[in-house]
Amino acid sequence: MKKHFLSYISVLLLALLLGCEKDTGTSGSSPVCFYLSPEPSTRATDTEFEKGDAIGVFAAARDDESVPAQLRPSGNFADNKKYIFDGEKFVPDGESNSIFITSYPIDYYAYYPYATVDNPLEFTFHVAADQESLTESDLMYARNTDGSGKNNIPLTF
């Protein structure tokens, strides 16, 4: 009887161990969003983001918790994820652009306006020939290097 009981317990424990998988941190968690904080001090007009404006976001994991991360040409924690302004904050443009928090420090680098960028270290920006929409020619960037593991990350452009 004891043999059967021990065999049963062993099989049950083995099944439990085989059923475990590594947690990636994305299951059931909300993606990171970005909000503007504080508003920049400027004399320029038309300086607010409008609903639908898009930014590109790169995220880099820190090797050393006390030193901000450096972007690499590719293979960062997140490479050029597109985030859209919803009137209050920047949210991912679809699930494939979502960035999820992790247990290790992440630094965020953002730019406006969104463009296709393969290598953040060789970013080329061209001023629009048609100046009808001046904001499309306003290159701005922001970064957050506090290594926060929060869902709402402040950015100052």
Please name every model-derived segment.
Residues 12-14:
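Short, low-complexity S/T/E/D/G/P-rich linear segments that nucleate or cap local secondary structure
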Residues 21-24:
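Bacterial signal peptide processing site
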Residues 1-9:
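Bacterial N-terminal signal peptides that target proteins for export
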Residues 16-19:
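C-terminal motif of bacterial Sec signal peptides marking the signal peptidase cleavage site
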Residues 26-157:
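Short, low-hydrophobicity acidic/polar segments
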